[in-house]
Each structure stands twice: as structure tokens, then as C-alpha cells.
Amino acid sequence: MIRAHLATFPPRRRLLRKTCDAILPQVDHLFVVLKDYDEVPGFLAKNPKVTAIIPDRDVKDAGKFWFTPAPDDIVFTIDDDIGYPPDYVTRTLAQLNAIGPEGNVVGYQGNIYIGPRGEGQKPWDNYLFHQPAEAVLGASLLGTGTLCARGSSIPPLSEIEPNAGACDIPFCAWLFGRGILPWMLPREGGWLSNDLPRNLKPSSLFQTVARQGHAAYRGLLWSFATRWPHAN
């Protein structure tokens, strides 16, 4: 099964509809976690290709890992603020197969730890999903809004939820512990689009969690980020 996993909340209802319209024709099934919803929207409830639940707690972005795939499934974890083109699944899956789906995961957003540089310069090279990249690159940290992996390379929710809000970090920590390598894929600029409206930016996890720099997930990040055999 080719499946997509998405977590969302009510202020992004319009984005959710747009994302579902883009992804549903490309996958066998879409799994959605609806934080803070009172009921499942009709366009999801009526679609036989959709399984949607309202969780009993705030799992934030860890909701992308709520559902457990079969080991041989192909899983795309997606975000509601990204514009996915019509060839997103076929093109991404072809690149995963070229690299080798056993022991590897792929995506379009990530960070590579470079190490100490000049004064005032950060030790990271950052690659945003909507910007161009010319080659496959080994990542130190891979974003889960544009992730593709076999089901066997998707961790259980229990591994991600303690760091909900920054799920890229526990995801990559879990990969590192199992020798699974994250890779960033080449693409043209604008092939994927950033669809987050300006009025919703203050509610994004980047603003509400990542910029707070909580010590717990910072420590987890540094436990693996400089130690990958294929990056840095």
C-alpha cells in the first residue's frame, strides 16, 4: 500500500482540503489525525480512501506517526502547508527505489551539520523544500513534511510523542539508532511550494516550538547529528 500520513488542526481547514485534493489521487490511502476537531469533516468522512481520527490528546506533529504501517507499505508523511505537485509520489518513489528502500529514507527538506565556521556563521547548511537542490545529499536531520520511507523505517508513536512539536528530531534519532540513513533529494525550485498564509505563521510549530529551543530536544539532536556516516 502507498499511504500518506497527515496531522492537522482546525485553523488550517482550508489548507487541509487543498492538501487532500493534491495527495489523494496519488496514494492508495490517506490517514489523518485531526487535533482539536469536534467532528471529522464531511469530505474526509465520506471518502473511502481516508481514515481520520480525533485524538484524545495533543500529539502535535507526532500525529503523523499515530497509525502503524505494514513493513512493506510505502509511507509519505506530509504537512498541510506544503503544495504537492501531481507527480510528487511517482517521482519521489522512483528516487527512493534508486537509492534503495532498505536502510534508507528520503525527503526534500533537511539540514547538514558542517561543523564550526567563521564568527557569526551557524554550523549547518539548511535546505528548504521549496528551494532547488541539484544532487542527492546525506542529511543530518530530515524533515517529516516531505518524507518517503518503507513502513519498516517508520517508528511507533511512542518514540516520537515525547518530543511532539519537533518530531523531525526524534524521528532521525530513531533512524540513527537503527542504522537507517536519511537522504535529501534533488528538485527544481518551486516544484514544492510553501502554502502557509502569513496570518497562520504565528501558530506554526516552527514559531511555537522550534524557536523556543527546548533543552530536551536540543540534547537529543546533538546525540546523533554530528555522527552520521553519510553526512557531515
Specify the residue positions occupied by each region the protein language model found.
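Short beta-strand-to-loop acidic/aromatic patch adjacent to the donor-nucleotide binding site
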Residues: 72-83
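Active-site-proximal specificity loops/subdomain of glycosyltransferases
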Residues: 34-73
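C-terminal catalytic/acceptor-binding lobe
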Residues: 1-5, 15, 160-232
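Residues at the starts of beta-strands that form the adenosine-phosphate
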Residues: 28-29, 74, 181
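Conserved catalytic core of nucleotide-sugar-dependent glycosyltransferases
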Residues: 83-157
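Short, charged/polar "capping" segments at the starts of alpha-helices
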Residues: 12-14, 37-43, 115-116
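Short, well-formed alpha-helical segments that are part of the catalytic scaffolds
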Residues: 6-26, 32-34
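Short beta-alpha junction loops
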Residues: 34-38, 110-113, 188-189
